[in-house]
C-alpha cells in the first residue's frame, strides 16, 4: 500500500539559526515586529509499506540515517 509522508526538520531549541535571524531582521525592516521565527525543511515522500506503522518506521529511519542530524535537529512525521 502507498502512504504519503510529510517530514518536517527544524533546529532544536537553543541552536543558532542565522537564516531565521536574517529573515526576522528583514521583516523588522518592513515594519513588522516578530518575537520568533523558525525555519524548516519539509519533505513529501510516497512510500510503499505493509501498513501505516511500517511507513512511519521507514520514515523515522530516513530521518535518522539521512535527513536529520540528531545533535542539532528535531523532526516531525505525518503519515497519510
List where the protein language model places each region:
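Long, contiguous binding/interaction regions
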Residues: 1-80
